């Protein structure tokens, strides 16, 4: 008797790394139940679209992805941040099978079961121990918590994903250990607010190996640093206790890299954003961090054109950047988000002014980035290889996260492998990237 073909699911994952982890968890569950992944919508039994709802532009991208899936397949399940407020999706595509918000894995699976029941053979082991991942084999996102207790005026993430809910330390460490055992060389620690990790658990201890570990930012970072992989910290708010992790970076336990979303520097704008406003103290802290860990790389994001931002505020930001010397910077033009308190603020900025300020900010940062990178010429850096070409390999230094930061382009006398970590001599630098030669393996 011929066995029925396994049902096939096409999957679209939009938005941030936190959403990508949600997608990985859903796909892992589906594969465990015997579902296969389809490369095309039209060859699948149904399509799952994991949406982003943070900005209106992201919502439009999500709606377009749903529309493409409806046109190509017709059987579509929608999940993710935009699904937390389903009215817009229902109005545009009343024929979708199901709409759920973020992290609602069981609801997504139930919708899949209703549309196309599984044909799982319990004798088959369909899922590797570390689960299914959508990133390359050599790096993985490690999500340590969900939600956020902050109430920034421009953000609706707490409305979409709720307040902070941290995973226990042993749960995070078990996942990290499995990833490293499966060949992951770099763990990218993510959440909505990484440095607040464990606050909701009151820093509860959990057993790990022959000891107990607190659910606390510094303790978790220290334990992750013992696993033998690069550990990169993202979405770190500059709370006072963040100073403690700089020592781990100086010791080489975790990468000398901090992704801190400062968003602005002007105290007046930060107050309107409902963000911490002591940026003069932040500059002092950055100087101390770099004194304690000279190799520290800082990444941050900034919003220009926020309601009420004056030319004086913007100039303050430019001057602050000159002094802070942020290594890697992402800039966004303020965009109203449905449901965000900032929509009601007076003195909204015109699109022309937003664009002009964004251009000036990026031009200033280009100069800063080039200056920072030029200092690395002649040094030796460890590089993790992401891509291998016929003559040049592309990788990243400890100062570069995948997708969002710069690259290092290397020539080598012998073939390189993706995921390999090599030592390179840096020969030259441009505004955002480095170029060098492999000097050791």
Swiss-Prot record:
Cofactor binding note: Binds 2 [4Fe-4S] clusters. One cluster is coordinated with 3 cysteines and an exchangeable S-adenosyl-L-methionine.
Protein name: Ribosomal protein uS12 methylthiotransferase RimO
Any one Gene Ontology cellular component term annotated for this protein: cytosol
Residues that hold [4Fe-4S] cluster 2 according to the record: 148, 152, 155
Family named by the database record: Belongs to the methylthiotransferase family. RimO subfamily.
Ranges of residues in domain TRAM: 374-440
Gene3D superfamilies for this protein: Methylthiotransferase, N-terminal domain, Nucleic acid-binding proteins, tm_1862 like domain
HAMAP family xref list: MTTase_RimO
Phylogenetic placement of the source organism: Bacteria, Pseudomonadati, Pseudomonadota, Alphaproteobacteria, Hyphomicrobiales
GO biological process, any: tRNA modification
The gene coding this protein: rimO
Assigned EC number: 2.8.4.4
Cofactor(s) needed: [4Fe-4S] cluster
Domain Radical SAM core per the UniProt entry, residue ranges: 134-371
Species in which this protein is naturally found: Rhodopseudomonas palustris (strain BisB5)
Disulfide pattern: none
């Amino acid at each position: 008797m011929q066995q029925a073909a396994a049902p096939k699911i096409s999957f679209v994952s939009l938005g941030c790394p936190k959403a990508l982890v949600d997608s990985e968890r859903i796909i892992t569950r589906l594969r465990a139940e015997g579902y296969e992944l389809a490369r095309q919508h039209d060859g699948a039994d149904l399509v799952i679209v994991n949406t982003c709802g943070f900005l209106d532009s992201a919502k439009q991208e999500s709606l377009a992805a749903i529309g493409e899936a409806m046109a190509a397949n017709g059987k579509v399940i929608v999940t993710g941040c935009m699904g937390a407020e389903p009215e817009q999706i229902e109005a545009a595509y009343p024929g979708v099978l199901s709409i759920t918000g973020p992290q609602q894995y069981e609801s997504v699976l139930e919708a899949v079961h209703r549309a196309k029941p599984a044909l799982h053979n319990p004798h088959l082991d369909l899922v590797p121990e570390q689960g299914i991942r959508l990133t390359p084999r050599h790096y993985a996102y490690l999500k340590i918590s969900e939600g956020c207790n902050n109430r920034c005026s421009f953000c609706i993430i707490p409305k979409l994903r709720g307040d902070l809910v941290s995973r226990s330390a042993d749960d995070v460490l078990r996942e990290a250990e499995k990833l490293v055992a499966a060949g992951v060389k770099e763990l990218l620690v993510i959440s909505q607010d990484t440095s607040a990790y464990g606050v909701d658990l009151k820093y509860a201890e959990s057993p790990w190996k022959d000891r107990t570990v607190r659910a606390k930012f510094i303790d978790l970072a220290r334990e992750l640093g013992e696993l033998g992989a690069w550990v990169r910290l993202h979405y770190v708010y500059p709370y006072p206790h963040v100073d403690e992790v700089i020592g781990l970076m100086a010791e080489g336990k975790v990468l000398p890299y901090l992704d801190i979303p400062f968003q602005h520097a002007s105290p007046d704008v930060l107050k309107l954003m409902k963000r911490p406003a002591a940026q003069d103290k932040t500059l002092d802290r950055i100087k101390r961090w770099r004194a304690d860990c000279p190799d520290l790389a800082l990444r941050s994001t900034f919003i220009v054109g926020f309601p009420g931002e004056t030319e004086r505020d913007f100039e303050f930001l430019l001057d602050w950047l000159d002094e802070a010397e942020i290594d890697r910077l992402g800039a966004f033009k303020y965009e109203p988000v449905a449901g965000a308190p900032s929509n009601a603020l007076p003195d909204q900025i015109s699109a022309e002014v937003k664009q002009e300020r964004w251009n000036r900010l990026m031009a200033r940062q280009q100069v800063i980035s080039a200056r920072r990178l030029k200092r690395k010429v002649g040094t030796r850096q460890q590089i993790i290889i992401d891509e291998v070409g016929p003559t040049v390999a592309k990788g990243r230094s400890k100062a570069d996260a995948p997708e969002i930061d710069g690259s290092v382009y290397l020539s080598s006398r012998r073939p390189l492998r993706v995921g390999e970590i090599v030592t390179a001599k840096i020969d030259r630098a441009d505004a955002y990237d480095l170029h060098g030669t492999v000097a050791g393996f």
